[in-house]
Amino acid sequence: MRAMNLTLLTDLYELTMMQGYFKNPTDQVVVFDMFYRRNPCDGGYAVMAGLEQVIEYIRDLHFAPDDIEYLKSLNMFDRDFLEYLRGFHFTGDVYAIPEGTVVFPREPLLKVVAPVMEAQLLETAILNIINHQSLIATKAARVVYAAQGDGVMEFGLRRAQAPDAGIYGARAAVIAGCIGTSNVLTGQMFDVPVKGTHAHSWIMSFPDEYTAFKTYANLYPDSCILLVDTYDVLKSGVPNAIRVFKEMKEKNPDFKGYGIRIDSGDLAYLSKKAYRMLDEAGFGDAVISASSDLDEYLIDSLKAQGAKINSWGVGTNLITAKDCPAFGGVYKLAAIKNSEDREFEPKIKLSENTEKVTNPGNKTIYRIYDKENGKIRADLICLADETFDESKDMIIFDPLETWKKTKIEGGSYVLRELLVPVFQKGECVYSSPSVMEIQKICRQEQETLWDETRRLVNPHEVYVDLSDKLYKIKSDLLEEMGTAALKYQ
């Protein structure tokens, strides 16, 4: 979970392919792209997350003696290959989109440029890390958006699929805008706020609800959120909470940070009734927090119903991304060159499914912003050595429906290159921001999205297009591959 050597966190076929390359020596340097094809949760975007853990993985990549012994026990790997693994370390380059950035289908979130054996080994761990955290960050961003500025707390540890999913899922949730997590270990590891109240068992362990509330308020006067649905929200919970608030206020006029949490029942109805009772008692500024199997759709519905809730604790549906439990990231070969070659040879993977045909070449991505309002107009995938003049018109092509072309007038847009260097010649050259710094980045990133892209249902799709040069290379390869295929029919 922590301080582990994750080198064997890989699929077996990565190692069998490595041995194949080892036994058939090659000096090939390759380019692999990590990207995804569809936005999770039927949304309009995703949030990049997990880069810090990828950096840690690559930086510590080595085969320990017990790793070598285990691989030897499989009776699949020759002695000379195992000896090679003893001295293995990463020597290549990695480029990535920074964490917290909003991203879209088909564009490389991460690019590896390295000797073929090294690049191949990285595949599984990179996908495991980025797929998980980007999924949870995306789900959390949707939940935070639905809350319309109210605080959202991540409460899902007990429902997460194992400790690591809880730890790093909470990290991703905070990146996406959650104000804190109930997960204390995540708080310690990443210096993020930890939040929580008390359970029904606290109430039940006392002779009566009032005594339980009073005891808790005396213990935590600056963070006194009382769970009011153990017995009856309106007949018992809220009246007892008001009684305690009055007593605390009499003792300390500066008493604040108080409120209630409702964990069951009709949240819209109960919150309205509870607010009226609190307001009439002089506590209209109380926090009214809700939990109970929330997700972005229920929060959006409660908002539409006028629920008097201003704080949300979201657990199962967030930490598991229950309605969209997988992020479909893939890792595909895009280009190859031998040591004597000056330029990469583009490679393309064909498929019966158009969306699975890859984009060839050593590429980068430019984000195209509207110069007036700062909103994203499109993303442009191009070759890594291409440059553009913002004063000139730009023609871009849809990678799937290539007859669709868009002209963006010169002077009306601003470009930003998304992929940044992370490793150069095996050395990390990137300084990871803190989680709370990434959260600020993510908040700013989401402001660059049009409202139509952020909406929860049937969002507008942001265009991810190809440059003229890349479009021509892809078209030529498709024609060449198609002609070659005809020879075998």
Task: Name each model feature, range by range.
Residues 195, 260, 288, 310-312:
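Hydrophobic residues within beta-strands of alpha/beta enzymes
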